[in-house]
Every structure is written in C-alpha cells, then in structure tokens.
C-alpha cells in the first residue's frame, strides 16, 4: 500500500489534505519505508515520510493491526522524528512542525469518530502547549458520506481486492487511493 505514495507528490498531497482538512498543501517530498535509526534503542521505519513547502514534516503509518497503533508508538515515532529533524546548535523554536498520522483498520481509540486529533495541553488551564507536534488517528472503519469516509472506503477496497504482502501491508495502485473520481 505505501508504495503507492513513494515519490507521488500529488497522491501524498491528496491524502494529507483529506486527513488534515486543508486545501493549501504543497508536498515537496514523499518517501516510503524510511528508517530512522537509534543507536541507543529501538529504531522506527516510517511507512510514508513527507514534507511540504512550509517545512512541515509528516509520518503516515498505515496499520492493519490495532497493536501497531498504540499511543506509546506515537510517542516513540514523534521523539525519533524530532531527533532526526534537528541539528546541533539549532534553536528550539526553529524545530519544524511535525505530524504523526496513524491510519488504522479499526477505531482503535473507540470513540466512534472518523478522526482523532491529539494535541498537548496545559491541564490546569486547558490551553494548548503549542510545541508544534501533532498526532492524528484516522478510523479506517469509518464510512461516512464525506471525504474521510470515501478515502477510508477506498483504503478498505484496496485491502479486500488485493493480496497482502508478508509485512501485513496492503498492495494497491494510485488509481485506487488517489483518484479525484473515487474521492
């Protein structure tokens, strides 16, 4: 499934714009299966890594198993993502805005919503912490009559109509997912 997005800037743009409900993205890079190594512990392999013209960085994870989308995995991905994106001497305020997006087969957060946007908040005031790190979960079982519902329908159609590789990833073509006709 993720190979659909490798180098396909328009397809990646369409996916991100649908999930983030934006229409102003300019994706300048899309790579699949990017490994972020960690000398001191666990490394991660990003299903889809992308960045846009504003310098925002995206990690999109396509998960068929609920166990692959636990909150602790989002925490690990965001920490290694940040470590990879920073340089020695860089001001903290210059860190790029990051998005970790999990597209899951099921409603792993069990709230019946199509999308869950997780932002850190100051508990005593309820104000946003504004650390420029965002986590988004997309409920793959959602079938509403809207852009997210249609996108998840297409993801599900790919899953059912194609073989599954040994890694548990769905195999599909860009016409299945990234076609204005199907969205």
Spans of model-derived segments:
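Elongated, amphipathic alpha-helical interaction scaffolds
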Residues: 1-183
């Amino acid at each position: 499934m993720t190979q659909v997005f490798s180098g396909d800037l328009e397809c990646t743009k369409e996916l991100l714009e649908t999930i983030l409900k934006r229409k102003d993205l300019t994706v300048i890079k899309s790579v699949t299966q990017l490994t972020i190594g960690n000398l001191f512990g666990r490394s991660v392999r990003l299903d889809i890594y992308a960045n846009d013209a504003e310098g925002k960085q995206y990690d999109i994870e396509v998960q068929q198993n609920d166990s692959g989308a636990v909150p602790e995995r989002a925490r690990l991905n965001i920490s290694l993502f940040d470590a990879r994106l920073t340089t020695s001497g860089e001001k903290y305020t210059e860190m790029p805005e990051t998005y970790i997006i999990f597209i899951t087969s099921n409603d792993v957060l069990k709230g019946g919503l199509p999308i869950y946007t997780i932002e850190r908040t100051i508990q005593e005031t309820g104000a946003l912490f504004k650390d420029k790190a965002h986590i988004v979960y997309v409920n793959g079982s959602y079938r509403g009559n809207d852009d997210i519902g249609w996108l998840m329908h297409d993801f599900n159609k790919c899953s059912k109509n194609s073989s599954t590789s040994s890694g548990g990833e769905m195999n599909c073509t860009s016409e299945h997912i990234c076609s204005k006709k199907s969205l």
